[in-house]
């Protein structure tokens, strides 16, 4: 494997070779996951803790399945039933769980930079499972695997990310990784969710038609009102769908072989209509979910083995 760190916090830390190494291992694990016995006990005896301080369905379940298929003991930790509700700090929580001889922390937290902060306070391996508006590296990797499987190469590809760019950790991790791979990235969304988007160095589209046309893959994002603190003047759902939603009519302007991705959860009838999200000709959304397990198996194996290479 090319990647040499014991933590995965940002796709900025991944070289082109790192990305391809992880994707290659993930493809092997995807094949294993089709077998009757879906096990590679490379992490037998290893304790993996899903330390989630935000709600999650796909990511937490995916990491738990990934850890168990590698033979690890996977423990789910939820802040809603923990001593954080009594005032315990993030680091005190990590140190207490670490005292139980935890080997890998999967950290999801509402504060940007939380995962990086944890790495500075524990010798255990750490994977960023989403920190505030900052990053979500394994989501970007599973998106890349999904795109690669559909297109066979990253060469010459154009990918559009549409929606709440400002609050999206998925957008950031994808942008950084795609730029490393030489993929052209276009962005589009309501002005209030495109603040400072020019800093990414991507093409900013002027309307939905431009965003859709010529793209090999389109990543739709939901509006994250929970991160706006009530400061965003959100249009009505009908108005949002009219100007920024992906509909069958808009798909007529897309390439015939375009694929549609969405990190979930989907708000049907808002950023994407059901007849697009469920259309097998375009939708790769469930492929993303399947690929998430394989990617996270690859990441867990890689970082844990790296811990002993230093």
Swiss-Prot record:
One Pfam family cited in the UniProt record for this chain: OTCace_N
Matching Gene3D superfamilies: Aspartate/ornithine carbamoyltransferase
Sites where the protein binds carbamoyl phosphate: 58-59, 108, 136, 139, 264-265
Catalysed transformations (reactions): carbamoyl phosphate + L-aspartate = N-carbamoyl-L-aspartate + phosphate + H(+)
Keyword annotations: Pyrimidine biosynthesis, Transferase
Annotated residues for binding of L-aspartate: 86, 169, 222
Main enzyme class: transferase
UniProt-listed Enzyme Commission number(s): 2.1.3.2
Keyword Transferase: yes
GO BP annotation list: 'de novo' pyrimidine nucleobase biosynthetic process; 'de novo' UMP biosynthetic process; amino acid metabolic process
Pathway recorded for this protein: Pyrimidine metabolism; UMP biosynthesis via de novo pathway; (S)-dihydroorotate from bicarbonate: step 2/3
InterPro entries to which the protein is assigned, alphabetical: Asp/Orn_carbamoyltranf_P-bd, Asp/Orn_carbamoylTrfase, Asp/Orn_carbamoylTrfase_sf, Asp_carbamoyltransf, Asp_carbamoyltransf_Asp/Orn-bd
GO cellular component: cytosol
GO MF term set: amino acid binding; aspartate carbamoyltransferase activity
Highest taxon above the source species: Bacteria
Job description of the protein: Catalyzes the condensation of carbamoyl phosphate and aspartate to form carbamoyl aspartate and inorganic phosphate, the committed step in the de novo pyrimidine nucleotide biosynthesis pathway.
Assembly, per entry: Heterododecamer (2C3:3R2) of six catalytic PyrB chains organized as two trimers (C3), and six regulatory PyrI chains organized as three dimers (R2).
Similarity comment: family membership: Belongs to the aspartate/ornithine carbamoyltransferase superfamily. ATCase family.
Name of the featured protein: Aspartate carbamoyltransferase catalytic subunit
Organism whose genome encodes this protein: Campylobacter fetus subsp. fetus (strain 82-40)
Gene that specifies this protein: pyrB
């Amino acid at each position: 494997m090319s990647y040499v760190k014991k933590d995965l916090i940002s796709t900025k830390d991944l070289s082109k070779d790192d990305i391809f190494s992880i994707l290659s291992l993930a493809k092997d694990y995807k094949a294993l996951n089709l077998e009757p016995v879906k096990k590679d006990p490379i992490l037998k005896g290893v304790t993996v803790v899903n330390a989630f301080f935000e709600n999650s369905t796909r990511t937490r379940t995916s990491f738990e399945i990934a850890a168990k298929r590698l033979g690890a003991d996977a423990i789910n930790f939820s802040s809603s039933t923990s001593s954080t509700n009594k005032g315990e700090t993030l680091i005190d929580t990590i140190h207490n769980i670490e005292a139980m001889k935890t080997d890998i922390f999967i950290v999801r937290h509402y504060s940007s930079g939380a995962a990086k902060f944890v790495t500075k306070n524990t010798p255990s391996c750490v994977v960023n499972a989403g920190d505030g508006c900052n990053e979500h590296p394994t989501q970007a990797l599973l998106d890349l695997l999904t795109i690669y499987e559909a297109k066979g190469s990253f060469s010459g590809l154009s990918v559009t990310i549409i929606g709440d760019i400002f609050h999206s950790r998925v957008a950031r991790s994808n942008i950084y990784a795609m730029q490393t791979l030489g993929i052209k990235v276009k962005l589009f969304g309501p002005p209030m969710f495109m603040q400072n988007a020019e800093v990414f160095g991507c093409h900013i589209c002027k309307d939905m038609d431009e965003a859709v046309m010529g793209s090999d893959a389109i990543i739709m994002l939901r509006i994250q009102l929970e991160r706006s603190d009530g400061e965003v003047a959100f249009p009505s759902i009908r108005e949002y769908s009219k100007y920024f939603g992906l509909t069958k009519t808009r798909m007529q302007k897309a390439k015939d072989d375009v694929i549609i991705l969405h990190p979930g959860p989907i708000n049907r009838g808002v950023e994407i209509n059901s007849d697009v999200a469920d259309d097998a000709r375009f939708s790769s959304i469930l492929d993303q979910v399947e690929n998430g397990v394989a990617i996270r198996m690859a990441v867990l194996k890689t970082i844990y083995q790296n811990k002993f290479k230093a």
